[in-house]
């Protein structure tokens, strides 16, 4: 594991500049801002916004002086009244398996963790957060022990992608052989409780003249906020993942308390009606394997029956341990037998290889350990260490 920044030496600093940060604005917001600031005339706002957009999101430029096709006097005017800012990277960790994790400070006291998971070859996925903390209290998830602070803005969601691109050296946006090829909203928070900002961020990330990651390579994972599922599909055209983990209400209510509000029957009805659902646009069901809890052959058969007729694949996730958890991971043989039942029924059911466990970057491990480390650093500083 490599840690490149010391938390004890990274005091809180305000992210928000005194000037507007253009980096996370939509195209329309960007054009309107340029007019409001008096940088361009209204009739030229759309053209100038397109120029800036390409420099910011295709080339990753943060310095107006590098925008060579923008007039010199316009560059100077932009630098005086606005900014292109990145959030502060408080800590960067690299796992022995190549997984990278960044602790990113969006504003004083507003910090999230973002994880890059390399795949075979050059491809890889970026796991982004949508909220600071979480309200769902899923009992197997370490993130759920962190109380919700607030939603992230669209700019703060996009900033996670920009930070990763900076670190991976992927500017300008490559057309092929990308190291960062997929985006998964599987970090901190419930994306559907922040749908407006998630949808706006996806619009920016998917724009073909910018970061240009296809919507078919963007997956939004939800624990099942049923009233927002249709809107998610209509507004984002993103791939859908469901954090399921159980096949009956009694067990799922223990694992995912949100099930008390939106039980499985309601959830499955909303999934079957998800816009664009087809064999080429399957739903991914996430199923964490908990020893003696949800890993029996009977549960596997019940899962097959539950998903009957739904174009789906099932990701089996070995439980990633964290301090104080009441659960253990299922034995590997048990997981393989569970997968075999699903495979025989015709469902792709890959067993997710745990990645980044040594830096607490694996599924369900985010955030809380960083909080402990920061608290320890504060105590050390207070003691004069």
Curated annotation (Swiss-Prot):
Keyword annotations: 4Fe-4S, Cytoplasm, Disulfide bond, Iron, Iron-sulfur, Metal-binding, Methyltransferase, rRNA processing, S-adenosyl-L-methionine, Transferase, tRNA processing
Subcellular location: Cytoplasm
EC code: 2.1.1.192
Species this protein is from: Phenylobacterium zucineum (strain HLK1)
Cofactor annotation comment: Binds 1 [4Fe-4S] cluster. The cluster is coordinated with 3 cysteines and an exchangeable S-adenosyl-L-methionine.
Amino acids binding S-adenosyl-L-methionine: 189-190, 221, 243-245, 320
Protein name: Dual-specificity RNA methyltransferase RlmN
Described purpose of this protein according to its UniProt entry: Specifically methylates position 2 of adenine 2503 in 23S rRNA and position 2 of adenine 37 in tRNAs. m2A2503 modification seems to play a crucial role in the proofreading step occurring at the peptidyl transferase center and thus would serve to optimize ribosomal fidelity.
Entry's family note: Belongs to the radical SAM superfamily. RlmN family.
Note, other: Reaction proceeds by a ping-pong mechanism involving intermediate methylation of a conserved cysteine residue.
CDD domains (UniProt xref): Radical_SAM (cd01335)
BP-aspect Gene Ontology terms: rRNA base methylation; tRNA methylation
UniProt binding sites for [4Fe-4S] cluster: 134, 138, 141
Domain spans labelled Radical SAM core: 120-352
Name of one Pfam family that matches: RlmN_N
Disulphide-bridged cysteine pairs: 127-363
Nucleotide-binding in keyword set: no
Keyword Iron-sulfur: yes
